[in-house]
Amino acid sequence: MPGQNLTREEAAARADLVTVKNYDVVLDLSGAADPAQETFRSTTTVQFSIGSAEPAGPGEPAESAGSDAATFIDLVAPRVHSIVLNGRELDPAEVYVDSRIVLADLMADNELTVVADCAYMHTGEGLHRFTDPADSETYLYTQFEVPDARRVFAVFEQPDLKASFTFTVTVPEGWTVLSNSPTPSPTHQDGNRTFAFAPTEPISSYITAIVAGPYRGATDEYRAPDGRVVPLGVYCRASLAEHMDSDEILEMTRNGFAYYEELFGTPYAFTKYDQIFVPEFNAGAMENAGCVTHRDDYVFRSRPVEARVERRAVTILHELAHMWFGDMVTMKWWNDLWLNESFAEFISTLAVAETTRFTDAWTTFQILEKGWAYNQDQLSSTHPVAAEINDLHDVEVNFDGITYAKGAAVLTALVGYVGRESFFKGIKSYLAAHAYGNATLADLLAELEKVSGRDLEAWTRVWLQEAGVTTLRMSIETDGDGIITSAAIRQEIPEGSPATLRPHRVAIGSYAVTGQGGSARLERTGRVELDVDGEITPVPELVGTRRADVLILNDDDLTYAKVRLDEASLTTGLEHVDAFTESLPRSILLASAWDLVRDGELPASRFLAAALRALRVEAHSSVVQGLLGRITVCLSHYLPQEDRPVAVTATADALLALARAAEAGSDAQLQLVRAVADHAVTEEQTVAVAAWLSGSQPLEGLVVDQDLRWELLIGLVAAGRAGEDEIAAEESRDLTTTGRERAAQARASVPTAEAKAAAWRRLVEDASMPNETQVKTLRGFRSVERNPELLVPFIEEYVREADALWETRTFHMAENLLTALWSPAPVGLEGVDPIGALEGWLASHRDAPAAFRRIVAENLDDTRRVAGAQACEAAAH
C-alpha cells in the first residue's frame, strides 16, 4: 500500500486552498457480470475554486489563482485515459503518481475531467463485486470509509471538502441501482439501463454510495408529525430475499426516526432512507447518507441467537443516528472519528433500550462493548478517546474499542455530569449550528457548556485527552461482629498505564445471600451512590452498618474503570454467582474477575468454574455469549499447556450437561449446543455432537438448521472426528456463499500439520481470496484448542511474511491477516518463544510505518498477557 497515504497537514493545506462545488460522476458498470472484465470506466467532472483568487463574474474571463496555485486530487486506478484541466490536456504519465493527480496553474474557478479504468474489488474496499453461487447473479456495492471513494472516481478525499455529487450509472438490464439520492426511472439502450441520479445534498465523499445488482426489497415510509414523508427501503440479494424480515426492520427504522427527530429536535436531512444488506462486508454496517449498507449475515437464514438479533437492532439504530451525527454534521478531520462513532454507539444503545424489546441493552453494553474497551485500553497502543490522527494509516487502525466503546461509555458519564436535559439541548444547538457542514469536538463542548453552565475543560482533559484506564478498589475494615469500621474507594493507576486519576460517579451495591444450595438467592439490600475523586474517597454511609455478603463496586455500571472488589466479596460472589437474581450485577462481578485473570491476579480455573456456574441460570443472551467466549479464551490461552487436556474435557462435559438440561428450544440451549461442538474432544462428547448433526439423537426443541449443521460439523472436524468427505458432502448440500465460506473454515480446522500448512499458503499467497472467505479461513486456521502445537511452525513464518503482506495487500486485508495469522496458543510449549519472535521483529523494524508496528505490538501485548495468566495459574497449583 505504499504511496496511498494522506497526512493531516496535507489535508488542512488543501482545505484552506480548495472549495469543491460539485462532482458529476459517470460509471459504466455494464460489464460487471462478466468476471473477465476486471475494470470499469469512470468519468469524473469536478468543479472547484481556489481561495486565493476572486471567482469570475458572468461574462468575465477566468482569473488565474496565481502562478504557484497547485493542489492534487486523489485516484486509485489501474489506468488513467485522460485528464483535462480547464480545457488543457494533462499527460497522465507526468501528473498521476502514487494515487494523486497533481493540478498546477489553477484558476479561481476550475473544471477537471478525469477518465479512468477503475478496478472491481474483492476486498470490501472501493467497488466490491460478488457473484452469488446460489444463482450466479452478480452484485456490486461501494465501501468508501476511510479513503476508498478514490478507487471509484477522482475525488478530493477528505471529510471537510463537502460537495454535491451527481451520479450517472449504467448497468445490465434487470439490475437496479441505489445511491444517496432516490433511484430515478432508467433509460434503456443496447441491453443496458442508465440511472441518472439527482444531485445530493452537500456531503463528504466517504458517505457517498453506489449499490447495483438484481437486489430484491420492500418499501415503506416514515410519516413525521409535521407531515413530512421519508421513503424507506430494505434490500438484499435475491437468494436471501425469502429470509429477510423486512417488517421488523422497517418498524424498528420508523420508530428510530421518530425517536431521533424528537430527541435531536432536527428533521432528517436527506431525501430517502434505504438499507441494503450486502455480501462479504468488512464491518457491521456503513452510514452512507440515505443509503446504508449492512453485512448480510444480519439476514437470518437460520435461527439466530437473541444476542445476534439485538446486535442487529443496535447496528440499525447506530447507522440511523449517523444521519444526523456524522453525515449532516461531519468531522473536519479524522481525529474526531471517535465523536461520530462513540455518539452513535451511545445513542443507539439508549434507543434500543427505550424503543425496542431489548430493554436491558445496557447489560449487553457492559459485557460486550465495555469489555472490548477495557481490553483495548490496556494495550501498549492505547490512545486518548480524542486521538491524535496524523494520517490515514492512523485512522485505519483506530476503528477500535476506544473509539467506539470507551468513547460511548465516557459520553454516558458526560450525560450524567451535565444532565440529560442539558446534554440533548446542547446536541440540538450543535446540529442546528453546523447542519451540512463540518465541526469539531470544541464546537460540541461549547454548546454543552453554554446550556449546562459547566466548565468542561478539566473533564475533557482527563476523560478524552488522556489515555488509559484507572482502577477502583474497595477497601473495607470490620470489627469482630462484622460491623464496618472503615470504608473507602481507592483509585490507582495500573502499572505502565498513561492514565491519571479521574473523577467518577459510582454506586456500591450491598448484596445478601438468602437460602441455601440450589435455592440460594443473592439480592441487593442497599445501595450507596457517590462521587469519587483523587486517590482515596471515604464512604461514610457504610460505616456502622453490618458488612454485606457481597459489595459490588460500580454497581449499575455507572463509570468506566477497572474494578477490584474486596477479597471477601469476590470469593462469596464467585461461589454464589448463580444466586444473583439479575444479570447486570452478576455480569459486573464476572467482568471484575475476568480483568483479574487477564492481569495475572486470579487463576483462570477459578473464573472458569464461576462462568460454568453462572451458565446454569443465565438467560441474558449477550451475557451467555460473552461468558462462552471467555471460557474459550481460558481453555485455548490462559490455562497452562499441561492443564488444558483435563480442563477442556471437564468443561465440555459440563457444557454437554447444561445443553441437555436447558429449556427446550431456548436461546441458551442453542448457544450451549454450539459451545459443546466447539470444545468436544472425548468419544462421548463427539458422539453426542455427531448424533445432533445426523438427527439420530435429537435434543427436544433444537432445530438443526443449515447454520447449526456447519457449527456441529466444524466442531467434529477440529476434534478429528470428521474430514474432507463430510466437508464436501455438506458443501454440496449448501450451495450458497455461506456454504462456501464455512467449507473453507472447516478445511482450515482439520487438525493436521498438512491442513494448517495448506491454509497458511492460501492465506498468504492467494491475494484473490474474497475478504469473508479469508475471515472464515483464518478462524479455522486458529482453531487449535485441542492441539496448539500445530501452530508452532508459523511463529517464524509470521515473522518472515509480515513485511510482504503489508506491502502487497490493501490496508484492510493486511490488517486482517497480520492480526489473525498470529496466535498465542503455543505459549508455554517447551522450546517455543513466541514473545521473543515478536520482540525481535519489532527491534528490527523500528522504522516501519506506525500502523504496521501497532498491529504487531498488539499481538505481542496479547501474547505477554497469555504468559502472565499461565504463570498465575501455575503458581496457584
Indicate residue ranges for each PLM-predicted region.
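A surface-exposed beta-strand-loop module
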Residues: 53-54, 66-67, 71, 75-133, ...
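N-terminal, polar/Ser/Thr-rich
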Residues: 1-41, 53-54, 133-139, 157-159, ...
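Short coil-to-beta strand junction motifs in C2/discoidin
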Residues: 74-79, 161, 499-506
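Short, hydrophobic/aromatic-enriched beta-strand segments in well-ordered soluble domains
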Residues: 42-48, 75, 109-123, 165-173, ...
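Hydrophobic helix-coil surface modules that form long, contiguous segments used
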Residues: 42, 147, 155-317, 346, ...
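Hydrophobic alpha-helical and helix-loop surface patches within well-folded domains
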Residues: 197, 228, 233-497, 633, ...
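Non-catalytic accessory/interaction domains
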Residues: 2, 58-64, 168-171, 176, ...
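Glycine/proline-rich low-complexity spacer/linker segments in large multi-domain proteins
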Residues: 8-17, 115-166, 213-221, 557-583, ...
